[in-house]
Amino acid sequence: MAIKSFKPYTPSRRFMTGLSSEDITAKPSVRSLLVKIPATAGRNHNGRITSRHKEAGAKKLYRIIDFKRKKFGIPGKVETIEYDPNRNCRIALISYSDGEKRYIIRPSGLNVGDVISSAESGLDIKPGNAMKLKSIPVGTIVHNIELKPGKGAQMARSAGGYAQLMGKEEKYVILRLPSGEMRQVLAECMATVGVVGNEDWANVTIGKAGRNRYRGIRPQTRGSAMNPVDHPHGGGEGKKNSGRHPVTPWGKPTKGAKTRRKKASDRLIISRRKGK
């Protein structure tokens, strides 16, 4: 997918880039697969901010995505490739032979007219086909990966995301994630063959603050620009440093300090990500 630039008729657009929409088919979305979800803007049910630097952003409807891929043995044809405002990859509308329509994450190389399917085993290794991990050959690139059988995909769902199946042992398979982490996943979990499309998303330059506001991202004030009452880094004369290791507004170490809590699934991680 090509990166496009813009004429600099304002300074903010000079370095702004975007993605071309040549792969998107000009058809309206399926209304039965659209649902309205109120924007929380980072607030909880009490109206208090629980996640800072968020706002509602541009109005949008949620597209119901099939993350489980449980229509075994029923082939589906790609009807359209669509833009999804809720994620950074494209989605594909699949029209199944029994008349049902569903959206899926579009893998790279999947085009209008292609036929895909889901099964426990026995399918061709081509982008868009979904099988259980135990039935996928070692070395295959996969995405849309379940962590618990039947729960739906939780890993490798964003633009350019993937994992590589490195080996199999008893009831687990070994996956290598893009971070370099080697992890065991239950062999009964479903995964889809291929890489998530729209890989060039990582090369897009936002260019101006307004585009982040459309996405629901608010400005982030530096702690050193605040007063001591507001942040541990605040205060001082001029641009004086805080004199301590970086911390959050609540005094917890940040910028490199490990904050992940230990949990039962840690035993499934064979090796941590690169450089850790």
Swiss-Prot record:
Residue segments, region Disordered: 213-276
Highest taxon of source: Bacteria
Entries under InterPro entries matching the protein: NA-bd_OB-fold, Rib_uL2_dom2, Ribosomal_uL2, Ribosomal_uL2_bac/org-type, Ribosomal_uL2_C, Ribosomal_uL2_CS, Ribosomal_uL2_dom3, Ribosomal_uL2_RNA-bd_dom
GO MF, one annotated term: structural constituent of ribosome
PROSITE patterns named in the record: RIBOSOMAL_L2 (PS00467)
Alphabetical list of SMART domains matching this protein: Ribosomal_L2, Ribosomal_L2_C
Pfam families in the cross-refs: Ribosomal_L2 (PF00181), Ribosomal_L2_C (PF03947)
GO biological process, one term: cytoplasmic translation
PANTHER family noted in UniProt: LARGE RIBOSOMAL SUBUNIT PROTEIN UL2M, RIBOSOMAL PROTEIN L2
Family: Belongs to the universal ribosomal protein uL2 family.
Subunit relationships: Part of the 50S ribosomal subunit. Forms a bridge to the 30S subunit in the 70S ribosome.
Name of this chain's protein: Large ribosomal subunit protein uL2
Underlying gene: rplB
